[in-house]
Amino acid sequence: MNVRYTEKKPPADVEKITCTAQQLSINPGSWITRFWSSCDGALIEDLVKIYSTDEIAERQQTYEIAEYFPGYLLIGDDSGGRLILVDRSAIERFYLLDSGCPSITDGLAFSSMDALIKEVVG
């Protein structure tokens, strides 16, 4: 899928990615660290926001991700009340769920970010 970036920040530097990954216990080879290597946050198709290295820690705290979704990382949202999470395990899975959703199993699961974006954009 070819996506259209409504807003795209320049790549994050290696030091910023490494620091953020260590702070949040993110696997250095994860999807989000690879994304930050190409752009440090973006708005895709006017809807899908992927958080920057400067935003992501605050979002984990605001939505209490460690408490409600241990083992997952909040990486973005759909600009309409749904959150985008990834599994912290080695399996690359993306989840889209309402911000008030009590369980990850109540959300939609995707094997790629492209599939998730396609669902959001319609």
Positions of the model-derived regions?
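Compact, glycine/acidic-enriched structural inserts
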Residues: 100-122
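Short, compact, well-ordered microdomains
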Residues: 89-99
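A surface-exposed partner-binding patch
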Residues: 1-85, 90, 121
